[in-house]
UniProtKB/Swiss-Prot annotation:
Assigned keywords, A-Z: Ion transport, Membrane, Mitochondrion, Mitochondrion outer membrane, Porin, Transmembrane, Transmembrane beta strand, Transport
Species assigned in the record: Solanum tuberosum
Organism domain of life: Eukaryota
UniProt cross-references to CDD domains, sorted A to Z: Porin3_VDAC
InterPro entries cross-referenced by the UniProt entry: Porin_dom_sf (IPR023614), Porin_Euk (IPR001925), Porin_Euk/Tom40 (IPR027246)
Protein name, per record: Mitochondrial outer membrane protein porin of 34 kDa
Keyword Ion transport assigned: yes
Family (UniProt): Belongs to the eukaryotic mitochondrial porin (TC 1.B.8.1) family.
Compartments where located: Mitochondrion outer membrane
Gene3D superfamilies cross-referenced by the UniProt entry: Porin
An example Gene Ontology molecular-function term: voltage-gated monoatomic anion channel activity
A Pfam entry, by short name: Porin_3
Entry note about domains: Consists mainly of membrane-spanning sided beta-sheets.
GO cellular component: mitochondrial outer membrane; pore complex
Length: 276
C-alpha cells in the first residue's frame, strides 16, 4: 500500500476494475511505436456494430512535462499537457479539444500523506467547477466530490465516499447522484501468488428502490494468462481471458450471456494491444 489516501477516484477502484475493466462487446485494436527521440505514437481502432472509429495519439515527454495530442476520425483534435511534480505532490493538467472552443479545462491535483485534492475549472466565461478531496490514511479515508455550475448557480454533482484498506481487502461505500444512489463494494485478495481475488458490488437506487448486485472473480492461470468472470442479479454473466503473448502486448477475448434469455444469443468482444 502506498502512502496517503490517494484521490477520490481511487475509492472503490479495486472492486470496479475487477468487475468491469477489460470487459467489452466490440472489437478493438491498438499498436504503439516508440521513436529513438522518445516520441510515443499509438494508433487505435474499434468496431461497434457497423460503426468503425479510429484515432492516433502522439505523446511527447520533456523532463516533467508530458504532451498528448490525439486526432480521431471525426476530425477532433484533443490536446492534454501534464506538468508532474512542479512542486512536491503537485500535478497540473491542461486539456482542450479543437474545434470545440468551450472544451478547455485546467485541473490541479495534490497528494499528501493525509490528503488528496483534485480541483478543475472549465476555461469558459461561466465554467463548471469541480472539487474532490479525501482525508485520512492509506488504511481509512473519507472524501467528497462536488461540481458547481457558475452559470445556473446549482450543484450538478454531489458525492461522498468512504474506504477501508488492509493487506488483503478493500471495502468502500459511496453515496452518489446527490444522495439517490448508495454503492457498497468489496475486494478481497485470496492468493497474491496467482492474483486470485473476489469482489462484489451492491448498488441501491432510492428513487426506484432497485438493487443491482454484481459479484466477480479473477485468477492467473500462468504468468502470462489470466481469467475473470462476473454475474449480476439480473442473470447477466460475463467471462474474460487475457493473454500477454509478448511483454506489454495483450490479447483479450470476452463474452456476455443473459442466462434468463439465452435465445437472444451471446455478445463477444476482442481486443489486441501491441507494444514493442
Amino acid at each position: 500500500m502506498g502512502k496517503g489516501p490517494g484521490l477520490y477516484t481511487e475509492i472503490g477502484k479495486k472492486a470496479r476494475d475487477l468487475l468491469y475493466k477489460d470487459y467489452q462487446s466490440d472489437h478493438k485494436f491498438s499498436i504503439t511505436t516508440y521513436s529513438p527521440t522518445g516520441v510515443v505514437i499509438t494508433s487505435s481502432g474499434s468496431k461497434k456494430g457497423d460503426l468503425f472509429l479510429a484515432d492516433v495519439n502522439t505523446q511527447l515527454k520533456n523532463k516533467n512535462v508530458t504532451t498528448d495530442i490525439k486526432v480521431d476520425t471525426n476530425s477532433n483534435l484533443f490536446t492534454t499537457i501534464t506538468v508532474d511534480e512542479a512542486a512536491p505532490g503537485l500535478k497540473t493538467i491542461l486539456s482542450f479539444r479543437v474545434p470545440d472552443q468551450r472544451s478547455g479545462k485546467l485541473e490541479v491535483q495534490y497528494l499528501h500523506d493525509y490528503a488528496g485534492i483534485c480541483t478543475s475549472v472549465g476555461l469558459t466565461a461561466n465554467p463548471i467547477v469541480n472539487f474532490s478531496g479525501v482525508v485520512g490514511t492509506n488504511i481509512i479515508a473519507l472524501g467528497t466530490d462536488v461540481s458547481f455550475d457558475t452559470k445556473t448557480g446549482d450543484f450538478t454533482k454531489c458525492n461522498a465516499g468512504l474506504s477501508f484498506t488492509n493487506a488483503d481487502l478493500v471495502a468502500s461505500l459511496n453515496l452518489n447522484n446527490k444522495g439517490d444512489n448508495l454503492t457498497a463494494s468489496y475486494y478481497h485478495t485470496v492468493s497474491p501468488l496467482t492474483s486470485t481475488a473476489v469482489g462484489a458490488e451492491v448498488n441501491h437506487s432510492f428513487s426506484t428502490n432497485e438493487n443491482i448486485i454484481t459479484v466477480g472473480t479473477q485468477h492467473r492461470l500462468d504468468p502470462l494468462t489470466s481469467v475473470k468472470a462476473r454475474i449480476n442479479n439480473f442473470g447477466k454473466a460475463s467471462a474474460l481471458l487475457q493473454h500477454e503473448w509478448r511483454p506489454k502486448s495483450l490479447f483479450t477475448v470476452s463474452g456476455e450471456v443473459d442466462t434468463k434469455s439465452v435465445d437472444k444469443g451471446a455478445k463477444f468482444g476482442l481486443a489486441l494491444a501491441l507494444k514493442p
